[in-house]
Amino acid sequence: HNWFVSANFGANAFFAEHSSQAKFKNTITFMPELAVGKMFNPWWGLRLQGGGGALHGFTDNAGSMLHMHYMHMNIDFMMGLINFFAKYNPDRKFDIVPFFGVGGMTRKHQQSFTIHGGIQAKYKISERFDANIEFQGMIFNDKMVETGGFPNDGLGGLTAGVTYYFKGRGFRTAPKQAVIDEMAAANLVLANQVTQLQNRPPEIKVIEKEVVRPVETK
Protein backbone atom coordinates (compact mmCIF):
# COMPACT_ATOMS: atom_id res chain seq x y z
CA HIS A 1 0.00 0.00 0.00
CA ASN A 2 0.98 3.68 0.49
CA TRP A 3 0.70 4.41 -3.24
CA PHE A 4 -0.06 8.01 -4.15
CA VAL A 5 -0.67 10.36 -7.08
CA SER A 6 -0.06 14.09 -7.02
CA ALA A 7 -0.77 17.11 -9.19
CA ASN A 8 1.10 20.40 -8.85
CA PHE A 9 0.85 23.67 -10.71
CA GLY A 10 3.03 26.75 -10.59
CA ALA A 11 5.71 28.61 -12.50
CA ASN A 12 9.26 28.00 -13.64
CA ALA A 13 12.17 30.12 -14.83
CA PHE A 14 14.61 29.04 -17.54
CA PHE A 15 18.32 29.75 -17.10
CA ALA A 16 20.45 29.57 -20.24
CA GLU A 17 22.54 31.75 -22.53
CA HIS A 18 21.51 35.41 -22.39
CA SER A 19 18.79 34.77 -19.74
CA SER A 20 20.54 37.21 -17.42
CA GLN A 21 20.19 39.91 -20.09
CA ALA A 22 16.40 39.59 -20.10
CA LYS A 23 13.89 40.72 -17.52
CA PHE A 24 13.29 37.96 -14.99
CA LYS A 25 9.51 38.09 -15.49
CA ASN A 26 10.04 37.23 -19.17
CA THR A 27 11.79 33.97 -18.24
CA ILE A 28 8.79 32.72 -16.23
CA THR A 29 6.29 30.26 -17.72
CA PHE A 30 3.48 28.00 -16.48
CA MET A 31 4.61 24.71 -14.92
CA PRO A 32 2.29 21.67 -14.49
CA GLU A 33 3.58 18.48 -12.84
CA LEU A 34 2.00 15.04 -12.35
CA ALA A 35 3.49 12.18 -10.34
CA VAL A 36 2.79 8.67 -9.08
CA GLY A 37 4.79 7.02 -6.32
CA LYS A 38 4.98 4.79 -3.28
CA MET A 39 6.26 5.25 0.28
CA PHE A 40 8.13 2.12 1.32
CA ASN A 41 8.39 3.14 4.98
CA PRO A 42 7.58 6.32 6.95
CA TRP A 43 10.68 8.14 5.79
CA TRP A 44 11.55 7.13 2.21
CA GLY A 45 9.86 6.45 -1.09
CA LEU A 46 10.11 6.73 -4.87
CA ARG A 47 8.07 8.65 -7.40
CA LEU A 48 7.85 8.95 -11.18
CA GLN A 49 7.15 12.55 -12.16
CA GLY A 50 6.42 14.12 -15.52
CA GLY A 51 5.67 17.59 -16.77
CA GLY A 52 6.00 19.97 -19.66
CA GLY A 53 5.02 23.29 -21.07
CA ALA A 54 7.03 26.11 -22.56
CA LEU A 55 10.47 27.62 -21.98
CA HIS A 56 11.55 31.17 -22.72
CA GLY A 57 15.08 31.43 -24.08
CA PHE A 58 16.78 34.51 -25.50
CA THR A 59 19.20 35.49 -28.23
CA ASP A 60 22.20 37.78 -27.69
CA ASN A 61 21.38 40.86 -25.59
CA ALA A 62 17.86 39.46 -25.17
CA GLY A 63 17.03 40.85 -28.59
CA SER A 64 14.54 38.07 -29.30
CA MET A 65 12.63 35.64 -27.09
CA LEU A 66 12.42 31.97 -28.05
CA HIS A 67 9.18 30.21 -27.06
CA MET A 68 10.00 26.50 -26.88
CA HIS A 69 7.76 23.58 -25.91
CA TYR A 70 9.25 20.72 -23.91
CA MET A 71 8.44 17.58 -21.92
CA HIS A 72 10.36 15.87 -19.14
CA MET A 73 10.16 12.79 -16.92
CA ASN A 74 12.22 11.82 -13.90
CA ILE A 75 12.36 9.30 -11.08
CA ASP A 76 13.06 10.70 -7.61
CA PHE A 77 14.20 9.30 -4.29
CA MET A 78 12.21 11.05 -1.53
CA MET A 79 13.18 11.30 2.15
CA GLY A 80 10.89 12.52 4.94
CA LEU A 81 13.22 14.36 7.31
CA ILE A 82 10.91 14.70 10.30
CA ASN A 83 9.75 11.08 10.11
CA PHE A 84 13.42 10.03 9.82
CA PHE A 85 14.81 11.96 12.79
CA ALA A 86 11.73 11.80 15.05
CA LYS A 87 9.72 8.86 16.33
CA TYR A 88 7.12 7.72 13.81
CA ASN A 89 3.71 9.20 14.53
CA PRO A 90 0.81 8.23 12.21
CA ASP A 91 -1.04 11.40 13.26
CA ARG A 92 1.83 13.74 12.33
CA LYS A 93 0.54 16.55 10.12
CA PHE A 94 3.70 18.12 8.69
CA ASP A 95 6.84 16.83 7.04
CA ILE A 96 9.73 18.20 4.98
CA VAL A 97 10.75 16.01 2.05
CA PRO A 98 13.93 16.62 0.06
CA PHE A 99 14.20 14.66 -3.19
CA PHE A 100 16.82 13.85 -5.80
CA GLY A 101 16.66 11.97 -9.07
CA VAL A 102 17.52 11.60 -12.72
CA GLY A 103 15.48 11.63 -15.90
CA GLY A 104 15.19 12.90 -19.43
CA MET A 105 13.93 15.92 -21.36
CA THR A 106 12.90 16.44 -24.96
CA ARG A 107 12.34 19.50 -27.16
CA LYS A 108 11.67 19.00 -30.86
CA HIS A 109 14.64 16.92 -32.03
CA GLN A 110 16.74 17.60 -28.93
CA GLN A 111 16.94 15.15 -26.03
CA SER A 112 18.91 15.46 -22.84
CA PHE A 113 19.73 13.54 -19.68
CA THR A 114 18.61 15.52 -16.61
CA ILE A 115 19.56 15.76 -12.96
CA HIS A 116 16.64 16.72 -10.77
CA GLY A 117 16.32 17.80 -7.14
CA GLY A 118 14.42 19.96 -4.71
CA ILE A 119 12.46 20.08 -1.48
CA GLN A 120 8.79 19.65 -0.61
CA ALA A 121 6.80 20.81 2.40
CA LYS A 122 3.61 18.79 2.90
CA TYR A 123 0.66 19.03 5.28
CA LYS A 124 -1.73 16.16 6.00
CA ILE A 125 -5.32 17.31 5.40
CA SER A 126 -6.94 13.89 5.87
CA GLU A 127 -6.14 10.19 5.58
CA ARG A 128 -6.36 10.47 1.80
CA PHE A 129 -5.12 13.99 0.99
CA ASP A 130 -1.99 16.09 1.55
CA ALA A 131 -1.39 19.68 0.47
CA ASN A 132 2.14 20.49 -0.61
CA ILE A 133 4.46 23.25 -1.79
CA GLU A 134 7.48 22.20 -3.81
CA PHE A 135 10.62 23.90 -5.07
CA GLN A 136 12.59 21.99 -7.68
CA GLY A 137 15.48 22.47 -10.03
CA MET A 138 16.70 20.65 -13.11
CA ILE A 139 20.03 20.68 -14.98
CA PHE A 140 20.24 19.50 -18.59
CA ASN A 141 22.28 19.68 -21.80
CA ASP A 142 23.61 23.04 -22.96
CA LYS A 143 22.42 22.33 -26.51
CA MET A 144 18.73 22.67 -25.66
CA VAL A 145 18.81 26.35 -26.70
CA GLU A 146 22.19 27.68 -27.83
CA THR A 147 25.66 26.35 -27.09
CA GLY A 148 27.95 28.63 -25.12
CA GLY A 149 27.83 30.72 -22.00
CA PHE A 150 26.60 28.41 -19.24
CA PRO A 151 28.15 24.92 -19.21
CA ASN A 152 24.60 23.57 -18.77
CA ASP A 153 21.08 24.94 -19.00
CA GLY A 154 18.81 24.90 -15.98
CA LEU A 155 15.21 25.17 -14.91
CA GLY A 156 13.87 26.22 -11.52
CA GLY A 157 10.25 25.98 -10.47
CA LEU A 158 7.89 26.64 -7.57
CA THR A 159 4.58 24.75 -7.47
CA ALA A 160 1.71 23.95 -5.13
CA GLY A 161 -0.69 21.05 -5.29
CA VAL A 162 -2.36 18.06 -3.66
CA THR A 163 -1.42 14.43 -3.15
CA TYR A 164 -4.00 11.63 -3.03
CA TYR A 165 -3.17 8.42 -1.16
CA PHE A 166 -4.91 5.21 -2.09
CA LYS A 167 -6.50 3.02 0.57
CA GLY A 168 -4.04 1.57 3.03
CA ARG A 169 -1.98 4.61 3.95
CA GLY A 170 0.20 4.38 7.04
CA PHE A 171 2.53 1.93 8.75
CA ARG A 172 2.28 -0.32 11.78
CA THR A 173 4.77 0.34 14.56
CA ALA A 174 6.94 -2.68 15.30
CA PRO A 175 7.03 -3.83 18.96
CA LYS A 176 10.08 -2.89 21.01
CA GLN A 177 12.92 -5.41 21.21
CA ALA A 178 12.49 -5.75 24.98
CA VAL A 179 8.89 -6.89 24.49
CA ILE A 180 9.97 -9.37 21.82
CA ASP A 181 12.70 -10.76 24.10
CA GLU A 182 10.24 -11.10 26.99
CA MET A 183 7.77 -13.03 24.82
CA ALA A 184 10.55 -15.28 23.52
CA ALA A 185 11.66 -16.07 27.09
CA ALA A 186 8.08 -16.91 28.11
CA ASN A 187 7.71 -19.21 25.10
CA LEU A 188 10.96 -20.96 26.03
CA VAL A 189 9.70 -21.59 29.58
CA LEU A 190 6.48 -23.08 28.20
CA ALA A 191 8.41 -25.26 25.76
CA ASN A 192 10.60 -26.60 28.59
CA GLN A 193 7.55 -27.40 30.69
CA VAL A 194 5.97 -29.31 27.80
CA THR A 195 9.20 -31.27 27.30
CA GLN A 196 9.35 -32.15 31.01
CA LEU A 197 5.76 -33.40 30.95
CA GLN A 198 6.43 -35.50 27.85
CA ASN A 199 9.53 -37.10 29.43
CA ARG A 200 7.94 -37.80 32.83
CA PRO A 201 7.56 -41.58 33.44
CA PRO A 202 4.00 -42.80 33.72
CA GLU A 203 2.61 -43.14 37.21
CA ILE A 204 1.59 -46.71 38.15
CA LYS A 205 -1.35 -47.00 40.45
CA VAL A 206 -2.04 -50.27 42.32
CA ILE A 207 -5.70 -50.94 42.64
CA GLU A 208 -6.74 -53.52 45.26
CA LYS A 209 -10.03 -55.22 44.62
CA GLU A 210 -12.12 -55.72 47.70
CA VAL A 211 -14.52 -58.64 47.59
CA VAL A 212 -17.56 -58.38 49.78
CA ARG A 213 -19.10 -61.72 50.68
CA PRO A 214 -22.62 -62.10 52.04
CA VAL A 215 -22.91 -63.13 55.67
CA GLU A 216 -24.07 -66.72 56.05
CA THR A 217 -26.86 -67.26 58.52
CA LYS A 218 -27.36 -70.56 60.37
Regions found by a protein language model. Give the residues of each.
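Short glycine/proline- and aromatic-enriched beta-strand/turn motifs that initiate or cap beta-hairpins
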Residues: 1-37
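Heptad-repeat positions
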Residues: 180, 187, 194, 201-204, ...
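Predominantly the C-terminal beta-signal and adjacent terminal strand-loop region
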Residues: 59-63, 126-199
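Gram-negative (and chloroplast) outer-membrane scaffold detector with strong preference
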Residues: 42-115
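Short loop/turn motifs that connect adjacent beta-strands in outer-membrane beta-barrel proteins
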Residues: 1-2, 43, 83-95, 125-128, ...
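Residues on the lipid-exposed face of transmembrane beta-strands in outer-membrane beta-barrel proteins
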Residues: 7-11, 34-38, 75-81, 100-104, ...
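Outer-membrane beta-barrel proteins
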Residues: 14-20, 57-61, 86, 107-111, ...
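Residue-level detector of the transmembrane beta-barrel scaffold of outer-membrane proteins
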Residues: 4-6, 45-47, 95-99, 130-132, ...
